[in-house]
């Protein structure tokens, strides 16, 4: 999945000469937390967040400074070193950018012009859908040595039992030679599937026997 498939295209923006009062009004009106700052050609030149506004605002004991604060221009507090994404970036790789930089949103640019925006909320919503967690079902974790072989065998079992696979993920294990396959299947009663897995020699690690399902 790539960024352009999940980004928001209708981006609320500011110019560097807009006042901080304008920024506050837009944050409240559109219920957003991030405002890219663009020039006349929609090049991203900065970013303002609700956190930036709170940190720069006068304290409640300095109300006399508030009117002056509101008339300041956006470029007086905006972040100028803005990390951006490309519409063809992979969502998984962009997730790492969010994590490494500790940011809450990424402007999306094409030919150096702003065309969209991606937030942590967009990413979370996407991963919920990718994992099938938004659909009723059961999660089953299986420890494997050979991913390809195990996937083929387990997929065949699902077909035989008419169990629909919602998603498959591969997790690392403490043993570098082992992986954990995480299946989300569309059934609220996974017991027949779990029993079939065990009969065929697969090591089910979740649900475990102690969970009263097997």
Curated annotation (Swiss-Prot):
Gene3D superfamilies recorded? CBS-domain
CBS domain spans which residues?
7-66, 78-135
PROSITE patterns the UniProt entry points to = CBS
- InterPro entries in the record, alphabetically? CBS_dom, CBS_dom_sf, Diverse_CBS-Domain
Q: Does the keyword Signal apply?
A: no
Q: In which pathway does it act?
A: Ketone degradation; acetoin degradation
Q: Which domain of life is it from?
A: Bacteria
Record GO biological process: acetoin catabolic process; sporulation resulting in formation of a cellular spore
Purpose: Role in growth and sporulation on acetoin or butanediol. Involved in the breakdown of these compounds used as a carbon source.
Protein name, as recorded = Acetoin utilization protein AcuB
Q: Which organism is it from?
A: Bacillus subtilis (strain 168)
């Amino acid at each position: 999945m790539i960024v352009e498939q999940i980004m928001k295209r209708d981006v609320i923006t500011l110019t560097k000469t807009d006042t901080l009062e304008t920024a506050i009004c837009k944050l409240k009106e559109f219920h957003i937390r991030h405002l890219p700052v663009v020039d006349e050609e929609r090049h991203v030149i900065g970013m303002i967040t609700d956190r930036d506004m709170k940190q720069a605002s006068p304290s409640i004991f300095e109300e006399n400074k508030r009117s002056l604060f509101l008339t300041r221009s956006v470029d007086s507090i905006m972040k100028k070193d803005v990390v951006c994404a490309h519409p063809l970036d992979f969502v998984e790789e962009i997730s790492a950018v969010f994590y490494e930089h500790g940011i809450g949103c990424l402007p999306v640019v094409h030919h150096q012009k702003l065309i969209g925006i991606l937030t942590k909320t967009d990413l979370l919503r996407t991963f919920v859908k990718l994992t099938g967690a938004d659909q009723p079902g059961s999660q089953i974790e299986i420890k494997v040595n050979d991913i390809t072989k195990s996937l083929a065998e387990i997929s065949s079992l699902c077909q035989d039992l008419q169990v629909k696979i919602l998603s498959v993920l591969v997790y690392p294990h403490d043993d570098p030679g082992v992986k954990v396959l995480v299946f989300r299947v569309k059934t609220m009663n996974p017991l027949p599937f779990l029993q079939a897995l065990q009969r065929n020699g697969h090591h089910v690690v979740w649900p475990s026997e102690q969970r009263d399902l097997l």
